Structure formats: C-alpha cells, structure tokens
Amino acid sequence: MAVAEDSGMIHDIVQAYLSRLGEHHVPVWRVYLFGSYAKGTAHPDSDIDLAIFLDQDEIDGFREDVHLMRLRWGIDLRIEPHAFARSDFQDMDPYVREIVASGQRVF
C-alpha cells in the first residue's frame, strides 16, 4: 500500500477523529499530524501520530492520553494521540518544537 494512495484516507480518518473529539467536548486548541505519515515514510502498520494541544494551561497527560485513546475506537486503532497543554506549545520544549517543525497542522 503506497503512502501517496493513503494520504486522502489518512486525512479522512483524522477528520473523523477530530469530529469525535468535538462530539465529546474535548477542548482542542491545535492538532498536528507528525511522525511517519507527516514525513511521507509510513508503511501499512504505521501509527497515525497526533499531537493534540488542549485549550488548558495544565493537564494530567496520562489521564488525557487514555481518554483520547478510548475515543479512537470505531474510527481507527492506528491513531496514536499525544495530549499536550496549550502551555506546552507556548513553552516550545524540544519535543514540541520538533513536532511543530516536522508535522502538519490539521486543526
């Protein structure tokens, strides 16, 4: 399965997931697709890595990750959500800087 053929499908999966987050009132501020799908190096078993910046200054990252993982059910289990607070984006630590620099903003 070629990645180029998957780009439209991945976009649809991400949009369906973002709709689900909206239905569950997740306070999404920004979302970036990162990792192999953003870099064009994905293979059929690749995760769909999403950095989800919540409109909150502080979060319990583990709790939010678990919540976001549950919401992927029925859409695509390859979705790998990574929760961040808005302040993580504003502080721009090296991990976040890499996500923003190499990722694709999808929301």
What are these regions (language model features)?
Residues 1-29, 39-44, 55-107:
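Catalytic core of pol beta-like nucleotidyltransferases
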Residues 36:
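P-loop (Walker A) phosphate-binding loop of NTP-binding proteins
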Residues 47:
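Conserved loop-to-beta-strand segment in the C-terminal subdomain of adenylate-forming
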Residues 50-52:
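Short beta-strand->loop micro-motif that forms the acidic, two-metal-ion catalytic signature
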